[in-house]
Amino acid sequence: MAEKKMWGGRFRQATAALVEEYTQSVSFDRALYAQDIAGSKAHARMLAKQGVLTADEAARIVEGLDMVLAEIEGGTFVWRRELEDVHMNIESRLTELVGDVGKKLHTGRSRNDQVALDFRLFVSDRIRAWRGLARDLVAVLAERAGEHANTLLPGCTHMQPAQPVSLGHHLLAYAWMLRRDAERLADCDRRTRVCPLGAAALAGTTYPLDPAYVAEQLDMYGTFRNSMDAVSDRDFVLESLFCGATIMAHLSRLCEEIIIWANPAFGFVRLPDAYATGSSIMPQKKNPDVAEIMRGKTGRVYGALTAMLTTVKGLPMTYNRDMQEDKEPFLDCDRTVSASLEIMAGMLRELGFNEGRMRAALRAGFLNATELADYLVGKGIPFREAHHLTGAAVALAEERAITLEELPLADLQAICDRIGDDVYAVLDPAAAVARREMPGGTGPASVAAQLAELSGWLEE
């Protein structure tokens, strides 16, 4: 005879030990215990409301589930791999505690819609947590941006000096990226937190269930219109993993800049001791290991998304056991994204900015060349011609190893006789930044407007 499984009525042989270990998921899906119990309590109450269970039966089941929850959170619950997953472990212990009435809990329900519910709730809970952490990081970025609204540094394209910008404006670029990440998560949550109960295995059920009642009990946005869709798709996992991957892409870019700026060749930032490490052989080293590891972990999250896309790409309708492989990629992504957002916020709070080095760097790379071109346009010269004339001025300054503003007026007028001595005020980096007051620009008023808008969003 086969060992007693909850599904074992038609089996005569026991599951091979190696197969049991290979197919079990309780080693990782136990993370869903709170959602599984919450879903089962809502299901039991709904069964009583619909007359499938008596009120007393539902009450006993709910009480038993609360006892199971207490055991799990108290560390006394015994997880059994031979029971395969979190659902069977909880149901088995429930039946031990309340007797045969516990066996009625699964009425009108399959593990197919049960796991879909549990995982939707779990993913929703976690991406809501990510959203909170993303908002916290936006707040830190906005705070540091406000402190450095008037600190200037070279803005780059192609990793080459381009135009002067304020450090505040630079930091706010990341704040806006992360705000969009938070908004994406809120949008993803609306599609994730939808109740699949009532779908059963795939075709629905003959019991008079009320999925909308369960959805209301669990603070969900609604129910499914198609039972096969409800149990067969994991697009909510894909979408959440994409959101996580996008967050990590943004964090990785910020890490890259911190790493570069910490190099003495730049010297723009001073790493806090709490977010750096040393060398086992070189006593002078202060390495940006935290930023490097975060940059490296980005690939790990990308891998989770790729793994999940590959898992679901060729599945026939409806539920397939392949879907068990949706948990570990998300769980790993969750740990990585959550920790990375929190650590980045802490690192940025303590990161030191070397304003002197940033200011000195403004002298290299002719960052004010565009100002000269715009100045010439203001003198009535077409932009393309102004661009060409400015290029000639840059070439002359480069040949003499001086800056544009160090070129004598006579040399500038030899290039274009419309240049007057008012050009030197235009070439000042601070003036260049101050003139860019259009919405979204790097000017002080624009930065202040950005900060005000982000502050309002953070207070919502």
UniProtKB/Swiss-Prot annotation:
Its EC number is 4.3.2.1. It is found in: Cytoplasm. It catalyses: 2-(N(omega)-L-arginino)succinate = fumarate + L-arginine. GO terms for biological process: arginine biosynthetic process via ornithine; L-arginine biosynthetic process. GO terms for molecular function: argininosuccinate lyase activity. Keywords: Amino-acid biosynthesis, Arginine biosynthesis, Cytoplasm, Lyase. Transmembrane segments: none annotated. It holds the Pfam family ASL_C2. One of its GO terms (cellular component) is cytosol. Its main location: cytoplasm. Pathway: Amino-acid biosynthesis; L-arginine biosynthesis; L-arginine from L-ornithine and carbamoyl phosphate: step 3/3. It is an enzyme of class 4 (lyase). Belongs to the lyase 1 family. Argininosuccinate lyase subfamily. This is Argininosuccinate lyase. It comes from Nitratidesulfovibrio vulgaris (strain DSM 19637 / Miyazaki F) (Desulfovibrio vulgaris).
